[in-house]
Amino acid sequence: YEIVKVQPGSEQDMDTLRKLDRTLEQRLDYLKEPRGLRDSGYLLVNPGNLRRVKRFLAEHRLHFDAKPLYVPSTRKRRALQQNNPLNSNEILSNYLGYEDQMQFVDRIAAAHPNIVKIKTIINSTERRPIKMMQFGYPSTTGEAKPIIWIDAGIHSREWISYSVALFFIQQLAQNPKYLPALKLIDIVIVPNANPDGYEFSRHTNRLWRKTRSKHENDRCYGTDGNRNYPFNWGQAGVEWNPCSEIYPGPKTESEPEVVGLIREMTSQKDNIKVYISLHSFGQQILYPWGYKTHTYPLDVMDLKSVGMKMSDAIRQYGGTIYSVVNSADSLYAASGASDDWAKSIGIKYAYTIELSPSDMSQNNEGFVLDESQISRVCNEMLPALDVLINTTLSEFLGQSVSLSSILYPHFPSTYPLITNELIYPPTLCAVPEKKGLIGFSKTTRSISAILFFFRTFLCIQTASYHFNHSLHLDLLNHKLITRTNINPREEKPTTIPTNKFGMVKKG
């Protein structure tokens, strides 16, 4: 395989790419489509089409740059034995094979039976169990608890998604900060939603995306599991060629992997309040609807607000920027996706999270993220999980749990410090040493007082600027008030009347 980088400079170049797409037996596999003129696109070209694609681009005078696919070696690990337990740190340094993943979750469940239930929701096409883990203490009220649902790896080449899910599992089981929350809510994690495709990508084709089913009269294997859900199935962003990477299957729910996920989620749909599907790559938090551009749910502002809180939390941890965008507007319209379906059955907060990296700029990594990056990506996603937990607690139960004391153990000094909800940039807001002004003139003391007030005012305003939600501090012993800030590129934020000191006006 080679990665072919193209950068259309005119509409004629865009037409050339579309023409190339039509001339091949199967649609071009875009790792990243060009979103307009002078925006780079990256094609994954298999050996059988490589010479043809290069010749076509050269004949049409479209500049391209081709490089061999960079695939770093992954450390092999033999199957676990009872006397050779998996060190939890290995999930942050290795891409584990399916068998190791399942033995890891089995041992987590066995070690923490009071808060973890494990269940096989279905077997894959090749008879591999697809397991889900449900974290939470039994309800003390007899009523069902709100649920956060997270699944990973429906696209098998997106290896980092499996690692993040396993890291979440390890943290929920072993980090004591989560125990109070687990008394109030449940968290479900499906760490490997496409085990057949994953093992095929490990041993045969590193960039394999689909499942491994083969349907009658289909000459190629696999269906795109994220085009197989029963919501506007087959309407946009699909190809009916079974060899295509975005083949939606011969019918909706044709894949056992999708059937199992749908069946289990449907049985708990009244309690699931948050749905997350982990993917890569792009560093994006995507919200519905994805089946059509410029089409949004009625509560899109709530989706944006919580998405921005997740993005802010990730950025606070280590500086990584995740954009919060509509999936169809940002990428392309694609129907039959899991987040659209989840939203359609009444789950309020439904997102697809495209993990790191942001692009293909470093060694063409994209999906092939080096194992050295696993720890960084996993750790920076933990604050986003905490946002979802607090959102579920506050919105659906009227509760709150402090997670911040253990949330940022290695918080970078170059990023703002956290004190509850108010953010203080460290340099600007450092408390000055008291030296006194005895002996200075009245004018000097007055100027100093004005400068101190101005400094305090800037501190509060900069705190608001640093993060995409605004905080108004009532200096006369009133509560801290948070208001949502809408993406400035899309819509103007709803303003709250304030006086000249930044305080919320009464009435």
Predicted stretch roles:
Residues 1-417, 422-432, 436-441, 446-449, ...:
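M14 metallocarboxypeptidase catalytic domain recognition
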